[in-house]
Amino acid sequence: WNMEERFQGHQDSPLTETGRRQVTALGRRLKAMAFDRLISSDLGRTRETAAIIAQYTGHTVHADRRLRERHYGVLEGLNAKEIHEQHPGVYQELITENPDYVIPEGQTHRQHYHQNIEVLNEWAGGTPGTTAALVAHGGVLDNFFRHVAHLDLRHPRCVLPANASISIIQHGTFYGSLRWVIKTWGDAAHLETLEPH
C-alpha cells in the first residue's frame, strides 16, 4: 500500500518481505538501546512489527488503539488519483488541510492528533525517567512532530521518516522549561547494510 501511495488508515496489510527484513534490522539495533515499555498500534502491521522487535528486546508488547493511523473512511484503499475521480469534494477538502474536516465514515485530523498526543503523554511523558518505544504509523509520527515543534495542524506534512526508522523525542527540563524535544528523527542507519531485493 505504501509503495502504491494508497490511503491505508485502519485497513490492514501484512508486512512485505522487505518490511520484515527492515524490522529485523531495527530489532537488532533496539536490542542495544534501553527502554522500559514497548507500545504498538493495535493494527496488524504494527503489531507484527512490534512482535519482531520484541523477539530481540524481550519486551511484552502493549497494544493501544489510539496509536492507529488516521481513519480515512471512504478514502481507505484509494490513491490520490482515485480519490480525485471518485470523491472530488472530499479531495478538495483534503488539499485545504482543514484539520476539522470530517472525512465521510472517518475522522478529522484534529481528532486523530488529540488521540495520538494523549498516548504520547500517558505512555512516554507520564512518569519521569520512563522510556517507551512506540511502534506507530507515519501520520502518528507526523502528529508527534507537530506537537513537539508546535506546528499548526493546517501546516502541510513536512517530515517523512523512512519505514522502520528510529525517532527519539524526550520530555524533560531543557533551558529552564519542561517540554518535549526532538533528539533524533528518522534515523535509518541500521537499514544501510540491507541488500536490496
Regions found by a protein language model. Give the residues of each.
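Phosphate-handling substructures
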Residues: 14, 55-118, 181, 195-197
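Active-site signature of alpha/beta-hydrolase-fold catalytic machinery across serine-
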Residues: 52, 143-147
